[in-house]
Amino acid sequence: MKLMYKIAVIGDKDSVLAFKILGVDVFITLDAQEARKTIDRIAKENYGIIFVTEQLAKDIPETIKRYNSEIIPAVILIPSNKGSLNIGLTNIDKNVEKAIGSKIM
């Protein structure tokens, strides 16, 4: 039997609720401590991708950094309904540069 990973999104209600329609497991968190605990808990529960709003991620950089060195789960930062802080884009830029040895963005 093939292992199927789940997808989760963590953030404030207004930013993440629409993901439920797509079949993504939604975890509504309001502060950094709760977000940190939620990420650590669901990372152990067969989630392959965890989307986190940039608004929360900016307050838990050590947790995000810890999971960036892991293959699974992939923690991906997304803008909240308040707009982008460009943290996610910056991380993608760094990963692309690391992978190909040149900055392209």
UniProtKB/Swiss-Prot annotation:
Annotated GO MF terms: ATP binding; proton-transporting ATP synthase activity, rotational mechanism; proton-transporting ATPase activity, rotational mechanism
Name of the molecule in the record: V-type ATP synthase subunit F
Source taxon at top rank: Bacteria
Transport keyword on record: yes
SUPFAM superfamilies in alphabetical order: AtpF-like
GO aspect biological process, one term: proton motive force-driven plasma membrane ATP synthesis
Family, per entry: Belongs to the V-ATPase F subunit family.
Alphabetized Pfam families for the sequence: ATP-synt_F
Annotated function: Produces ATP from ADP in the presence of a proton gradient across the membrane.
HAMAP family named in the record: ATP_synth_F_arch
Keyword annotations from UniProtKB, A to Z: ATP synthesis, Hydrogen ion transport, Ion transport, Transport
Keyword flag Transport: yes
